[in-house]
């Protein structure tokens, strides 16, 4: 018998429950002990008479297809992994899994159906290179991780209102997603998915961390607050419109978005950590941050911009580096800001294509020259492939090779000019 001993106990419990109550056709609960493993459909059939199973169920081995019938709740986790012959799986009666739903290393699995599933703690879908269909009726989940799959859609998560972690990475055929999420208490990450990925999070009001890479279009129509860090790195976005956003609690990073020509953050007043705009080659006019008043770390703006409007800026707790290759850019307004004591860090640098001003704020020396006296935070936009942080038990593998594939590291707020340089360097590694 291929099912572990726990299944024998389950069958006995089921028979006993039926004998004790002849009016009940399905026992309310069947215990499989701490855990049990099924390697054949016959093993799963042994618990088909249960509406609830208690314990962790693992499905593995040489199954061509598999199904869990009648079971409505798993008081534990369901893991399906390392089956080279499993092509389809269905459990359309399950409404609730109190633990995790793990699907990993299923190389020919094309479909997984959980049509009634509304509640689960976490879903981890990792290394599913053939899957095209995944369905749920999901309403509540804490963590969602989808990595290294061939899914074209993740609509099975489209009705979720809140999560802790939402991490979608290295899914080369995934080109669009429209979400109903209203809050993300830990992190929202999209990276290394299909070409021209389009995302819409128009109901999202609050998030702790957001990092987007390799995205072509994004909509945040209602986003008001990011409690920690917000990063847009190596995207093909033509524009960024976050006109409802008023506060970023830690760092704000807009780095190496080669097609970005407009950034509108018209209600943003506070950046609690480092503020970085770097290497966005088409961003010639930076006028969407004109209401920013305070920056709690250092500020770094580098590129080919002719206009930079920071007209409301009153305080920068760290250093400041402004470096434009355009000779049309004027440092006058920024030099006035520095002379009024608004820059509180250890240095102030402002350069355009013709002149340079560098001030060490810890001393009284001022240097002006026509040559570049201070190195900028410029770097190439190419980043190495990297695995996303999917979970302690499952690591993603990259399934695509286009520019800068990999999840962004969390950017630590800089408190000095050199801190900003280090933060940009980390982002581009």
From Swiss-Prot:
<dbReference type="GO" id="GO:0005886">
    <property type="term" value="C:plasma membrane"/>
</dbReference>
<feature type="glycosylation site" description="N-linked (GlcNAc...) asparagine">
    <location>
        <position position="389"/>
    </location>
</feature>
<feature type="glycosylation site" description="N-linked (GlcNAc...) asparagine">
    <location>
        <position position="267"/>
    </location>
</feature>
<feature type="signal peptide">
    <location>
        <begin position="1"/>
        <end position="19"/>
    </location>
</feature>
<keyword id="KW-0325">Glycoprotein</keyword>
<feature type="glycosylation site" description="N-linked (GlcNAc...) asparagine">
    <location>
        <position position="21"/>
    </location>
</feature>
<dbReference type="GO" id="GO:0009277">
    <property type="term" value="C:fungal-type cell wall"/>
</dbReference>
<feature type="region of interest" description="Disordered">
    <location>
        <begin position="361"/>
        <end position="410"/>
    </location>
</feature>
<keyword id="KW-0732">Signal</keyword>
<keyword id="KW-1003">Cell membrane</keyword>
<keyword id="KW-0472">Membrane</keyword>
<feature type="modified residue" description="Phosphoserine">
    <location>
        <position position="339"/>
    </location>
</feature>
<protein>
    <recommendedName>
        <fullName>Cell wall protein ECM33</fullName>
    </recommendedName>
</protein>
<keyword id="KW-0961">Cell wall biogenesis/degradation</keyword>
<feature type="glycosylation site" description="N-linked (GlcNAc...) asparagine">
    <location>
        <position position="82"/>
    </location>
</feature>
<dbReference type="GO" id="GO:0005576">
    <property type="term" value="C:extracellular region"/>
</dbReference>
<dbReference type="GO" id="GO:0005739">
    <property type="term" value="C:mitochondrion"/>
</dbReference>
<keyword id="KW-0336">GPI-anchor</keyword>
<dbReference type="GO" id="GO:0098552">
    <property type="term" value="C:side of membrane"/>
</dbReference>
<feature type="glycosylation site" description="N-linked (GlcNAc...) asparagine">
    <location>
        <position position="227"/>
    </location>
</feature>
<feature type="propeptide" description="Removed in mature form">
    <location>
        <begin position="407"/>
        <end position="429"/>
    </location>
</feature>
<feature type="glycosylation site" description="N-linked (GlcNAc...) asparagine">
    <location>
        <position position="304"/>
    </location>
</feature>
<keyword id="KW-0449">Lipoprotein</keyword>
<feature type="glycosylation site" description="N-linked (GlcNAc...) asparagine">
    <location>
        <position position="279"/>
    </location>
</feature>
<feature type="glycosylation site" description="N-linked (GlcNAc...) asparagine">
    <location>
        <position position="328"/>
    </location>
</feature>
<comment type="similarity">
    <text>Belongs to the SPS2 family.</text>
</comment>
<feature type="glycosylation site" description="N-linked (GlcNAc...) asparagine">
    <location>
        <position position="56"/>
    </location>
</feature>
<dbReference type="InterPro" id="IPR036941">
    <property type="entry name" value="Rcpt_L-dom_sf"/>
</dbReference>
<dbReference type="InterPro" id="IPR051648">
    <property type="entry name" value="CWI-Assembly_Regulator"/>
</dbReference>
<feature type="glycosylation site" description="N-linked (GlcNAc...) asparagine">
    <location>
        <position position="196"/>
    </location>
</feature>
<feature type="glycosylation site" description="N-linked (GlcNAc...) asparagine">
    <location>
        <position position="241"/>
    </location>
</feature>
<comment type="function">
    <text>Required for proper cell wall integrity and for the correct assembly of the mannoprotein outer layer of the cell wall. Important for apical bud growth.</text>
</comment>
<dbReference type="GO" id="GO:0005783">
    <property type="term" value="C:endoplasmic reticulum"/>
</dbReference>
<keyword id="KW-0134">Cell wall</keyword>
<feature type="glycosylation site" description="N-linked (GlcNAc...) asparagine">
    <location>
        <position position="209"/>
    </location>
</feature>
<feature type="glycosylation site" description="N-linked (GlcNAc...) asparagine">
    <location>
        <position position="234"/>
    </location>
</feature>
<dbReference type="GO" id="GO:0031505">
    <property type="term" value="P:fungal-type cell wall organization"/>
</dbReference>
<keyword id="KW-0964">Secreted</keyword>
<feature type="lipid moiety-binding region" description="GPI-anchor amidated glycine">
    <location>
        <position position="406"/>
    </location>
</feature>
<keyword id="KW-0597">Phosphoprotein</keyword>
<feature type="compositionally biased region" description="Low complexity">
    <location>
        <begin position="361"/>
        <end position="401"/>
    </location>
</feature>
């Amino acid at each position: 018998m291929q099912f572990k001993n726990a299944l024998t106990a389950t069958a006995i419990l089921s028979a006993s429950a039926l004998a004790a109550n002849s009016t009940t056709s399905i026992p309310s609960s069947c215990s499989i002990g701490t855990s049990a493993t099924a390697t054949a459909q016959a093993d799963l059939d042994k618990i088909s008479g249960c509406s609830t199973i208690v314990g962790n169920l693992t499905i593995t081995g040489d199954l061509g297809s598999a199904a869990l019938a009648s079971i409505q709740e798993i008081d534990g986790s369901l893991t399906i992994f390392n089956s080279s012959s499993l092509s389809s799986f269905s459990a359309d009666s399950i409404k609730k899994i109190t633990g995790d739903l793990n699907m990993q290393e299923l190389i020919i699995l094309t479909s997984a159906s959980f049509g009634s599933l509304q509640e689960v703690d976490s879903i981890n879908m990792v290394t599913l290179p053939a899957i095209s269909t995944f369905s749920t009726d999901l309403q509540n989940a804490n963590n969602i991780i989808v990595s290294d799959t061939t899914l074209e859609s993740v609509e099975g998560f489209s009705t979720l209102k809140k999560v802790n972690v939402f991490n979608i990475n290295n899914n080369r055929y995934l080109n669009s997603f429209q979400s109903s999420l209203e809050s993300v208490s830990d992190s929202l990450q999209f990276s290394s998915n299909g070409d021209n990925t389009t995302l819409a999070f128009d109901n999202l009001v609050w998030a702790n961390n957001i990092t987007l890479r390799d995205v072509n279009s994004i909509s945040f129509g209602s986003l008001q607050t990011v409690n920690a860090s917000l990063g847009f790195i190596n995207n093909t976005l033509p524009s960024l419109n976050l006109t409802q956003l008023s506060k970023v609690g830690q760092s704000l990073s807009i780095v190496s978005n080669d097609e970005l020509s407009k950034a509108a953050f018209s209600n943003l007043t506070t950046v609690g950590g480092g503020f970085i705009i770097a290497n966005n080659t088409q961003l010639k006019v930076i006028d969407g941050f004109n209401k920013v008043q305070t920056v709690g770390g250092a500020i770094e703006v580098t590129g080919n911009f002719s206009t930079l409007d920071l007209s409301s800026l009153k305080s920068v707790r760290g250093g400041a580096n402004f470096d434009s290759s355009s000779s049309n850019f004027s440092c006058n307004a920024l030099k006035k800001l520095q002379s009024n004591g608004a820059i509180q860090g250890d240095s102030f640098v402002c350069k355009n294509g013709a002149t340079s001003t560098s001030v060490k704020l810890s001393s009284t020396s001022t240097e002006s020259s026509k040559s570049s006296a201070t190195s900028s935070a410029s770097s190439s936009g190419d980043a190495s492939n990297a695995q996303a942080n999917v979970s302690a038990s499952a690591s993603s593998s990259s399934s695509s090779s286009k520019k800068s594939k990999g999840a962004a590291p969390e950017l630590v707020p800089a408190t000095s000019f050199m801190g900003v340089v280090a933060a940009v360097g980390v982002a581009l590694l």
